[in-house]
Amino acid sequence: MDKRHDPSRRIIAPHGTQLSCKSWLTEAPMRMLMNNLHPDVAERPEDLVVYGGIGRAARDWDCYDKIIEVLQRLEDDETLLVQSGKPVGVFRTHADAPRVLIANSNLVPHWANWEHFNELDKLGLAMYGQMTAGSWIYIGTQGIVQGTYETFVSVAKQHFEGISKGKWILTGGLGGMGGAQTLAGTMAGFSVLACEVDETRIDFRLRTRYVDKKATSLDEALAMIEAANQAGKPVSVGLLANAADVFAELVKRGVTPDVVTDQTSAHDPLNGYLPQGWTMAEAAAMRKTDEAGVVKAAKASMAVQVQAMLDLQTAGAATLDYGNNIRQMAFEMGVENAFDFPGFVPAYIRPLFCEGIGPFRWVALSGDPEDIYKTDAKVKELIPDNPHLHNWLDMARERIAFQGLPARICWVGLKDRARLALAFNEMVKNGELSAPVVIGRDHLDSGSVASPNRETESMLDGSDAVSDWPLLNALLNTASGATWVSLHHGGGVGMGFSQHSGVVIVCDGTDAAAKRVGRVLWNDPATGVMRHADAGYEIAKNCAKEQGLDLPMQE
């Protein structure tokens, strides 16, 4: 019997102001853990899987129940330690210390590979936390929509003189992360054809308005794209098909998309990528009897897909890796030039990171959408001269369906994160918001990740693989008074390829919270500016100087 599987479980976080815990500082992590497993949020909540292949919120259901039990009795001078989804200890700390400290799927480097991790996973000794799954701050697909939108806007600027009308994107994957591509693409003015092997995922994206149409054949999908482009109105199409098959077929036909990328769960060849010619049922059965065979077949299909991406790039498509490590998998299967197309961070996002700009997100613990709409208005009020940001907030309100507790994401930088957070705390204090909010972010951020095939690819000074930076980020956020802090390995790109840290803080309207918020939401993005300044980026050096950061070696 698998202790991680329980189809009878249906987890819904409490709404309103009645507490199940002793304070909002412990109520918040409890609600956010539960929200990660909301049926409209998680990919497979009955298995504790939130997104990204096998990214879980807790190690098994016994651990989940015990975490909830401990949070409900935890005092405001105690800290719960969670080791790979298992609550292992409660210790006396102090009121400004984190209430929860989390470490997920961290392995000594020599053993940091999927083979060793999978053995530990089978023994119940480890849990893959992805990024925001095991750190309890996943907000559904919205969590990556704006970052994807910003990327596609940058693609249009760099390759098409800012004009996306009449152009289309080819991609793969409509899971928790990949599902953002279709909505982000149409928001940026592109049509999008997204291949997905799991029909339930396409149907879910249709239901939540992330996908406009479903197709069951390539001809049907291409006709939908062509009609939309002729009409000058972007459309997103979820095509029930294997991405490797479709990408290769387009090369064969001589059909070249304007943009090519991919967000299948290629980072996990055992659990995340369906080999060509296989059904999902066949893959599920084979995972139980021949793991090595599944991995080999999946990576062979990835090689086919990446070769097709390279061929489409040669034919004129703007081609980019969207951070799932598919190039590495193809390279290991003999595609020697797999890295000839760039990752999205060095190509389009790094200038933002240099100014500490990244995925700032917040969640209304009340469950009331009005609290989010009021904070949207506050963001516009405090940042009046950023029409691009205002446009994003307007589009988000109009087009993004809330999943679970209402939430919002918007990319803001060092100079604005603390300012916004303090304003939100004041709104809680004066009753404008009906309950506290939590503020967090993706681990994909300016100073919180080392990932040589994604966030830290092609660093100016060659420091791609140096992982001191996310460790320092986690330590500083702990010292600064975050409500919970996490340190993970393997998120996004898989075992052995990344280390990263997460942070969440509660705005409960108290003066003590204001002090913590001011420290955390300044220091957290400041570490990103520091990291990029240290690597030699002039934008980061200038930002550090303008914002008065004390960086001894930059004097």
UniProtKB/Swiss-Prot annotation:
Superkingdom, natural source: Bacteria
InterPro entries assigned to the protein according to its UniProt record, in alphabetical order: Urocanase, Urocanase-like, Urocanase_C, Urocanase_central_sf, Urocanase_CS, Urocanase_N, Urocanase_Rossmann-like, Urocanase_sf
Active site: C410
Pfam families: Urocanase (PF01175), Urocanase_C (PF17392), Urocanase_N (PF17391)
Name the UniProt record assigns to this protein: Urocanate hydratase
GO biological process: L-histidine catabolic process to glutamate and formamide; L-histidine catabolic process to glutamate and formate
Keyword field contains Lyase: yes
Entry's family note: Belongs to the urocanase family.
Main location: cytoplasm
Source organism of the structure: Shewanella baltica (strain OS185)
Cofactor: NAD(+)
Catalytic activity: 4-imidazolone-5-propanoate = trans-urocanate + H2O
Pathway(s) the chain acts in: Amino-acid degradation; L-histidine degradation into L-glutamate; N-formimidoyl-L-glutamate from L-histidine: step 2/3
Residue intervals passing through the bilayer: none
Swiss-Prot/TrEMBL keywords: Cytoplasm, Histidine metabolism, Lyase, NAD
Residue numbers binding NAD(+): 52-53, 130, 176-178, 196, 201, 242-243, 263-267, 273-274, 322, 492
Biological function: Catalyzes the conversion of urocanate to 4-imidazolone-5-propionate.
Cofactor note (record): Binds 1 NAD(+) per subunit.
A GO term for molecular function: urocanate hydratase activity
Entry's EC annotation: 4.2.1.49
Subcellular location: Cytoplasm
GO cellular component terms, A-Z: cytoplasm
UniProt enzyme class: lyase
